[in-house]
Curated annotation (Swiss-Prot):
The active site is at residues 103, 200. This is tRNA-specific 2-thiouridylase MnmA. Gene3D superfamilies: Adenine nucleotide alpha hydrolases-like domains, HUPs, Translation factors. The record marks 128, 344 as: Interaction with tRNA. InterPro entries: MnmA-like (IPR004506), MnmA-like_C (IPR046885), MnmA-like_central (IPR046884), MnmA-like_central_sf (IPR023382), Rossmann-like_a/b/a_fold (IPR014729). One of its GO terms (molecular function) is ATP binding.
Amino acid sequence: MTDNSKTRVVVGMSGGVDSSVTALLLKEQGYDVIGVFMKNWDDTDEFGVCTATEDYKDVAAVADQIGIPYYSVNFEKEYWDRVFEYFLAEYRAGRTPNPDVMCNKEIKFKAFLDYAMTLGADYVATGHYAQVSRDADGTVHMLRGADNNKDQTYFLSQLSQEQLQKVMFPLGHLQKPRVREIAEKAGLVTAKKKDSTGICFIGEKNFKEFLSSYLPAQKGRMMTIDGRDMGEHNGLMYYTIGQRGGMGIGGQKGGDNAPWFVVGKDLSQNILYVGQGFYHDALMSTSLTASQVHFTQNMPDKFTLNCTAKFRYRQPDSKVDVKVNGDKAEVIFDEPQRAITPGQAVVFYDGDECLGGGLIDNAYQEEKICQYI
């Protein structure tokens, strides 16, 4: 039997059930485990209670229960500089960012990893639903989590080979109900705690209110692609490509009652374009361009790739051809795709292996750029 007692694993503990069970499993496997709570955002709810304080109490209770030391580390400045400023800049540019991708890249597997090294860590572990496999030569591959509903490789797609070398995902082979079962059997205080949802720094707050407290909203015209005036929008940043509803327009007199969708944005003219029908022509595209393209393995500067891709979390994979040039790529779809959204991640897969990904810049219909500018 392997003696893990000399291998130190520092676990990122959020106060949720997933990271609690991660720490428990590693402790049971004999590792030298330390728990660390990351405070990334100064947050108080409507009653003036800091939700991070409550989460830290749960971390402390779980750590005491399973018998591991624990620390708290403050990454508020790093989070603001590396994740939140990016989030605001993307919305300013009329895009729809994915802060979770950036948080994993910059905070959980960079700032936290660096901190863990000061504690003498051999590895860091988190409660993400993903798996890693290690080749004989030490190369690490990232694989989808066994629970298809929970697989989080989409959000981990910007991790480098160097980061993956130091990572463990103990929940990767488990289904979520089994994780709760383990927590309940061990009597962990977090066993029945509900999963957190949404963007971590917004929490349960109204998204519109939150965004408008940081970025001024500018109202403007709402139009169809063929130029019909449809009234006024409340600010382009509040709308995302493919969004249904929230525009204040229902069935039009003398027209059909098909639902309305956001089909485009013109930032320079401050116009929101809308259209009827889920598969409205303006929502369909045949390719995209991406930047900040990155692979988990060391790859040449220029190459082509035939693989599958996801353009948003929890969507089925689609077959694509990828032409990579440095940190940029053109991604050509086998079948037209709906509502490709600038700012979101495009993530590449070969079977169950997550190869990497990038951030979507623009979508195209044949050679023509879609109206997402």
